[in-house]
Curated annotation (Swiss-Prot):
The keyword Nucleotidyltransferase does not apply. InterPro entries: Peptidase_A8. It is found in: Cell inner membrane. This is Lipoprotein signal peptidase. This protein specifically catalyzes the removal of signal peptides from prolipoproteins. GO terms for cellular component: plasma membrane. It is a multi-pass membrane protein. PANTHER family: LIPOPROTEIN SIGNAL PEPTIDASE. The keyword Transmembrane applies.
Length: 169
């Protein structure tokens, strides 16, 4: 027997749309206002810097001839499918997990769109200290990392806290 969608974690899918809109808008702004390699300092240790990532996190496999585009696209589709099933199986009251899943789905879909449309992922957030620069990333990457951190955090909650959170107390 099927469950009403609003009683499942799918109730939180609106967050996926929020993540996608923020990610898409930020990348479109970069594409419309920056040339590849252009940097704009905002505050000390933080620049906007337009980069193209043909690989995964930290440009993993970026220089491997193009097959990685489809490989990482397939991984993104699989992750989205698994997380959608997990959201459907969870209660809408399990806020922390469902928000985390929505953040990861939104980020994965944002980067998937880039891979399929452009052939690369648009990165633009550049943190640095002195001459050392953290690898450039984007909002989708940020939402994926925050979602993953939320899942880890949820794993550390005591069983009493978990039951209180699921009941909305």
């Amino acid at each position: 027997m099927s469950k009403p969608i609003c009683s499942t974690g799918l109730r939180w899918l609106w967050l996926v749309v929020v993540v996608l809109v923020l990610d898409f808008a930020s990348k479109q702004w970069i594409l419309g206002n920056f040339v590849l390699g252009q940097s704009q300092p905002l505050i000390p240790s933080f620049n906007l810097f337009y980069a193209r990532n043909y690989g995964a996190a930290f440009s993993f496999l970026a220089d491997h001839g193009g097959w990685q585009r489809w490989f990482f696209a397939g991984i993104a589709v699989a992750i989205v499918a698994v997380l959608l099933v997990m959201m459907y199986r969870s209660s809408a009251q399990q806020k922390l997990n469902n928000i985390a899943y929505a953040f990861i789905i939104g980020g994965a879909l944002g980067n998937l769109f880039d891979r399929l449309w452009h052939g690369f992922v648009v990165d633009f957030i550049d943190f640095y200290v002195g001459n050392w620069h953290y690898p450039t990333f984007n909002l989708a990457d940020s939402f994926i990392c925050v979602g993953a951190a939320m899942i880890v955090l949820e794993g550390f909650l005591s069983p009493a806290n978990k039951s209180a959170k699921s009941k909305g107390e």
